[in-house]
C-alpha cells in the first residue's frame, strides 16, 4: 500500500521526498533501504534525516529534512541554470553562503543550509565592511525584501545551536 501511495503522490506533483525514521541518527540502515525504494519509484530528490541532521530530536530532525526536500530541488535548478549561462566548467569557482556564515561549493549546497544564508551574508558583509574602518563593536541592521535582521558584533562571532525565529 505504501509503495502505491508513493507512486500516486509522485505522479500527481511531487518529485522530492523526505524520509525521517525515529532512530536513524543512530541506526540509518532503514532510511537507506527506504531511499532505494523511493528512488526506484522515480523521485528525483530524496532527503534523508540522518544526512540532514545528526540530532536525536526527531521532530527537529524531521523539520530540517522536510525543508531540505522542499528547497534542494529548487536550488539545484537555479544552480544548473546559473551554470548554463557561462562557457566552460566553472563549477569549482562558484560558492554559496550557508546559514552558518560559511561558504560552500555549489555542488555541496543544500536547501537546509540556505534558509538563513541571507541574514548570515548580511552579518559577514557588515563585519568585513567595519574591519575597513578598524571598528570591532558594531550593531547591524539588514533590511531586505522579506525580512529585517538586527545583530551585534563585539570583535568575535558568537555561535548557537538552539535558536528561535519568529517564535519557531
Regions found by a protein language model. Give the residues of each.
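N-terminally biased helix-coil "hinge/interface" segments that flank
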Residues: 1-168
Amino acid at each position: 500500500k505504501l509503495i502505491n501511495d508513493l507512486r500516486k503522490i509522485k505522479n500527481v506533483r511531487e518529485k522530492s521526498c523526505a524520509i525521517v525514521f525515529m532512530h536513524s541518527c543512530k541506526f540509518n540502515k532503514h532510511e537507506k533501504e527506504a531511499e532505494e525504494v523511493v528512488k526506484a519509484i522515480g523521485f528525483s530528490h530524496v532527503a534523508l534525516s540522518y544526512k540532514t541532521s545528526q540530532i536525536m530530536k526527531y521532530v527537529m530532525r524531521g523539520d530540517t529534512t522536510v525543508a531540505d526536500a522542499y528547497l534542494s530541488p529548487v536550488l539545484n535548478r537555479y544552480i544548473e541554470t546559473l551554470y548554463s549561462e557561462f562557457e566552460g566548467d566553472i563549477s569549482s569557482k562558484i560558492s554559496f553562503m550557508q546559514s552558518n556564515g560559511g561558504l560552500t561549493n555549489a555542488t555541496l549546497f543544500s536547501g537546509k543550509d540556505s534558509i538563513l544564508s541571507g541574514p548570515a551574508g548580511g552579518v559577514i558583509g557588515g563585519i568585513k565592511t567595519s574591519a575597513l574602518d578598524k571598528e570591532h563593536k558594531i550593531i547591524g541592521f539588514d533590511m531586505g525584501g522579506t525580512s529585517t535582521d538586527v545583530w551585534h558584533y563585539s570583535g568575535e562571532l558568537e555561535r548557537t545551536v538552539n535558536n528561535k525565529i519568529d517564535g519557531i
